[in-house]
Design a protein with these regions (language model features):
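Terminal helix-turn-helix DNA-binding modules in bacterial transcription factors
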Residues: 122-127
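…primarily DNA-binding HTH/wHTH and HhH modules…
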Residues: 140-165
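Helix-turn-helix DNA-binding helix
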Residues: 112, 116-119
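Basic nucleic-acid-binding alpha-helical/helix-turn surface characteristic of O6-alkylguanine DNA
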Residues: 1-112, 160, 164-165
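Short Lys/Arg-enriched helix C-cap and helix-to-coil transition segments
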Residues: 130-137
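Active-site phosphate/pyrophosphate- and oxyanion-stabilizing loops and adjacent acidic/basic residues
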Residues: 38, 120, 155
Length: 165
């Protein structure tokens, strides 16, 4: 079974889904339990139970990150992505705390300089935001660009990181 824990933050509700091997999904959305259950069945073929055996460390690290006490997350994760998306998200983990890169710069980081839109798609489908810090990816002109949990949350995370340096 997949464990689920949900908790409220200043930026909204955060949910963590995890199996024994690691965290599979982090969500800032107020997703219904039915929607999360469907995601789990489609991606892992399992249902959800509320629990803390597999989510405690991730929750602790995320709370410390969001309070400015931690600059990176290192709890175990289960990467449910295509090879290309894995390359994009792993490259983004190398972007230092408090810094940003453009979609084009990330495309160059993975050796695919023309794959700018594909980098955007990988970020849009990132099941583990914060762990894979897609909020650090901005448009080439310096504007924020999109973010699955809203531009306000993206700005909040970037401001948090710049204040905690």
């Amino acid at each position: 079974m997949i464990e689920s824990v949900c908790f409220k933050l200043l930026i909204g509700q955060l949910s963590i889904l995890a199996v024994k091997e690691g965290v599979v999904k982090i969500s800032f959305e107020n997703e219904s339990m039915e929607k999360m259950e469907k995601w789990c069945r489609n991606h892992l073929g399992m249902g959800i139970v509320e629990g803390t055996d597999f989510t405690t460390e991730a929750k602790s690290q995320i709370l410390n990150y969001l309070s400015g006490k931690r600059k990176s997350l290192n709890f175990p994760v289960v990467h449910l992505n295509t090879l290309f998306r894995k390359r994009v998200l792993e490259a983004e983990r190398n972007i230092p705390y408090g810094q940003t890169r453009s979609y084009g710069e990330v495309a160059k980081m993975i050796g695919r300089p023309k794959a700018i839109r594909a980098v955007g798609s990988a970020n849009a489908n990132n099941p583990l935001p914060l762990y894979f810090p897609c909020h650090r990816i901005i448009n080439a002109n310096g504007t924020l660009g999109g973010f699955g949990w809203g531009v306000d949350v993206k700005q909040y995370l970037l401001d948090l990181e710049s204040k905690s340096l």
